[in-house]
Amino acid sequence: MHDGTLQRLFPAAKFDEPLRRYTAWKIGGPADALLEPSSIQELLSAVELAGEHGVPVTVLGGGTNVLVRDGGIRGLTIRLAKSLRGVKLSGETLVAEAGALYPVLANMTASRGLAGLEFATGIPGTVGGAVFMNAGAYGSETARVLLWADILRDGRVVRMGPEELGLSYRRSILHDHPGWVVLRAAYRLHPGDPEDLRERIREFRTLRMNGSPNRPSCGSTFKRPPGDFPGRVIEAAGLKGLRVGQIEVSTVHANYFVNLGGGTASDALRLMELVRERVRERLGVELEPEVRVVGEP
């Protein structure tokens, strides 16, 4: 859609913008139009306008757990992580906009003596992405603390609880409705000792730093297979260091696929499929991707 329509409809957007600049994997072709709304109202207006003119909409959060294909994304891409970070605390309830960063929420609530989100320090993503994926770490997950989320669906804002959202392991009903958009979410917390909570966060942060590679990756590539861990399975299959193009199975943690510099989405997808095939052949284990793939080849 390069006939000037997008420029007329969304003058505040960036056009033909390389999305590798906005993803943790440093991979991704161009967005026809990339909009970073400064308010929820601007977001609502953009989605409504896109719908009226038949412009497809893709929403990105913090760029983790997502692979943008090399052909980029057609239509309008909306990135939430830049501005939609509003947060409000009322008693033991936290309400955060979709672009708020999970580690920031973990630190903020811990410092105020509110427990429940310490696990979020290990999730380098946004509220919107965390609800979409039911993100979790260190024995907890979003579903355990989520009260509700406001979802833009079919032109209306609908408040949905955890059951309505169908939260399960790294999944929600949002996977089946790519046009739905998380606007904000509320969390039920409980009192805790600030120093104890901060110490727990420090421990989680140390675990993450020691167990994660220092090269660009999307985070966890595959979901946990029943009764096991994907990193252990991939390592047991002898696949650490396996490489396609500039994408490599990390030698630090085998469930992280790292970009050595200049890697492409096609490299990443080929490596993911190769790892799945070899794990299946050698160990009889079926790995399911955790990463969300968007865009065109």
UniProtKB/Swiss-Prot annotation:
A GO molecular-function descriptor: FAD binding
Residues at the catalytic site: R170, S220 (proton donor), E290
Cofactor(s) required for function per UniProt: FAD
GO annotations of cellular component type: cytosol
Enzyme nomenclature, EC number: 1.3.1.98
PROSITE patterns: FAD_PCMH
NCBIfam families: murB (TIGR00179), PRK13905.1 (NF010480)
Purpose: Cell wall formation.
Family: Belongs to the MurB family.
Protein name: UDP-N-acetylenolpyruvoylglucosamine reductase
This protein's encoding gene: murB
